[in-house]
């Protein structure tokens, strides 16, 4: 069974800051608190429209984190150049639409193999580990392995949004099957999107899971309980699921 890690996404600390155009709350300070509470890494999504995390945030976080930085980004020339310059520990390549509220689905790796292969090589040559954010689909998983990505991150949005227990169980089985298949190809498996304190345990219990990236639920809980307690509680639930 893979060691299970928690990556805390702090995008919505920046969302709150940017809502009033202030210098607070500071994502860098939030990252420090999350690390102290047990986060194994910090995830930020530098979107093309800079709606929350900024270039400055990325630079400072890269210089100050004690754990690992995971930079989520679209597969564009601008973002690849920023990543190569900044050199985060990990880059997770994601699809991106300007009009979306949050990432709506996985990358179509199978439909753009050459583009993805070039991006993975460019990042790997800069010493960056690459993850591809994809749906729990065998064709996409095979394509991810073929283009040279060492990691995938399985999109858990459909599982999180399931309206019935039966639908959620079906989505969970699909994710578990995908994780097993990915591991059989030598890929390391992460997961994220829509995971909460109520639904995380079943995903955490999947033996192949290496890291869960969770943000909105933790920041939402932090408003009520404080960030340190919110991160610690999520980590406790994940590890409890592993027995």
UniProtKB/Swiss-Prot annotation:
One of its GO terms (biological process) is pyridoxine biosynthetic process. It is found in: Cytoplasm. It catalyses: 3-amino-2-oxopropyl phosphate + 1-deoxy-D-xylulose 5-phosphate = pyridoxine 5'-phosphate + phosphate + 2 H2O + H(+). 3-amino-2-oxopropyl phosphate binds at residues 9, 20, 194, 215-216. Its main location: cytoplasm. The active site is at residues 45, 72, 193. Keywords: Cytoplasm, Pyridoxine biosynthesis, Transferase. The record marks 153 as: Transition state stabilizer. GO terms for cellular component: cytosol. Its EC number is 2.6.99.2. This is Pyridoxine 5'-phosphate synthase. It comes from Escherichia coli (strain K12). The lineage of its organism: Bacteria, Pseudomonadati, Pseudomonadota, Gammaproteobacteria, Enterobacterales.
